[in-house]
A protein has these predicted regions:
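Structural motif marking the loop-to-transmembrane transition
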Residues: 1, 5-16, 170-181, 212, ...
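Juxtamembrane loop-helix boundary motifs flanking transmembrane segments in multi-pass membrane proteins
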Residues: 1-4, 71, 117, 156, ...
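Extracytoplasmic/periplasmic domains immediately adjacent to an N-terminal transmembrane anchor
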Residues: 2-176, 360-361, 365-399
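Transmembrane alpha-helix boundary/anchor motif
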Residues: 23, 27-28, 124, 192-196, ...
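Transmembrane alpha-helical segments that form the functional core of multipass membrane systems
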Residues: 178-295
């Protein structure tokens, strides 16, 4: 373990990844999304329908907290020009047949476009349109039932048979910071550990060397470093940005422990496929976005196809993010996140066995190669000795 710790602190690239990235990235993400919400975001509306239905929809959108209808355009090109000039952060498009399709009792469509410079813009325009759409569905159904001669009481029972109201106990103002930063914190831990371990392995392969310490000792070195980083990310940073911290400390520490050892086993397994230390930075851009979407934070797990749900089980962050959301935001206890803990422990067992087998194979390969090299050098030395002895014999014979 001590040898691996010395290697970690002797490699400047690994120190940058582990310490600088692990400590600064959570703070940077928190500062970017500190407010968590954007109110009255300017949008442009392109109403090609010019119907009473589209005008009513636009009025309701403008009344929401999330967006402000700053411009009404006659064409999509005009709306795109406004977005390029950064005068608006989104566009809502009503097609020409919007009112006609509703009149024919057919499904109508509304298109939304958001400036993806920030997820907040996408969230705002999507939430505003979805809330108004749900309200419009009630209005359309009420109008259609009234045209059939139904009474107000019967219409109310048909439109809303079970009265319901929106109640969001753990994120009342739909703050983006609460659910995004919670996921980002765990991704920082997983990704920086994987990239740091991959850089170390890439350096060893480029030098045609192998690890001389035991796998358990090396794993303990990384776990020791990252327990501190994980406690900083999951305990200090949420308090720094005044995020909800409803969970009990022992439950959070247990989740941190299982997540860290799972990340160590995951990193030791997949870092074997990294041959050069520079290639790992290319994987950073791909893996981070993929893990975020597969965690269930932005893309609901219930809506994932079976294939992508299976892919999400590859990464420790999937189970850890779900468990951290439940503990930190909803005050869940360890028995309540039993499926996530089982997932982390199962991953740890699988990746540990895989890492041991790959390490055993690599050591055998290295020892075999070293043995062959020694035999080759021995034969070469023996050949030189025999040649020297032959030369000496010839020299003695010529005297």
């Amino acid at each position: 373990m001590l040898k691996e710790l010395k290697r970690i602190f002797a490699d400047s690239y690994v120190l940058i990844i582990f310490l600088l990235s692990g400590l600064l990235y959570p703070v940077i993400y928190g500062l970017i999304y500190y407010k968590g919400t954007v109110d009255e975001m300017p949008v442009a509306v392109v109403d090609l329908s010019q119907s009473s239905d589209s005008r009513r929809f636009i009025q309701k959108i403008d009344a929401t907290r999330e967006v402000d209808v700053a411009y009404k355009c006659v064409s999509m090109a005009e709306g795109q020009e406004l977005m390029e000039e950064r005068k608006v952060r989104g566009i809502v498009l009503f097609p020409e047949d919007y009112g006609d399709r509703l009149a024919r009792m057919e499904q109508a469509t509304i298109s939304t476009y958001a400036d993806m410079a920030s997820f907040l813009y996408y969230k705002n325009i999507t939430m505003a349109v979805n809330h108004v759409m749900i309200d419009e569905l009630r209005t359309i159904e009420t109008t259609r039932f009234a045209s059939l001669g139904m009474t107000d009481e019967a219409i109310a029972q048909m439109v809303e048979a079970i009265p319901a109201e929106e109640n969001i106990p753990f994120n009342t103002n739909w703050s983006f910071l609460i659910f995004f930063l919670s996921a980002a914190l765990l991704l920082v831990i997983q990704q920086t550990m994987f990239f740091g371990v991959s850089v170390m392995n890439g350096s060893m392969r480029e030098g045609k060397a192998t690890h001389d310490g035991s796998l358990i000792g090396r794993a303990a070195a990384y776990a020791l470093v990252y327990v501190g980083i994980a406690c900083y990310c999951l305990l200090v940073v949420p308090a720094l940005f005044k995020m909800p911290q409803r969970g009990q400390l022992p439950d959070l520490l247990a989740l941190i422990f299982f997540f860290v050892i799972d990340c160590v086993a995951f990193s030791f397994t997949f870092s074997r496929f990294v041959r050069h230390r520079e290639t790992v930075f290319v994987e950073l851009l791909f893996m981070s976005s993929l893990c975020l979407f597969l965690s269930g934070t932005i893309w609901p797990v219930s809506s994932m196809p079976p294939f992508w749900k299976a892919v999400s089980w590859v990464f420790p962050s999937t189970f850890a993010i779900q468990g951290f959301h439940a503990i930190n935001n909803a005050a869940a206890t360890l028995p309540m996140i039993r499926p996530q803990l089982i997932g982390l422990i199962s991953q740890f067992a699988f990746y540990s066995v895989a890492a041991f087998l790959m390490d055993y194979r690599e050591r055998n390969h290295y020892e075999s190669r070293l043995h062959k090299l020694i035999e080759k050098r021995t034969r070469l030395i023996e050949g030189r000795i025999k040649a020297r002895q032959a030369q000496e014999a010839v020299f003695e014979a010529t005297k």
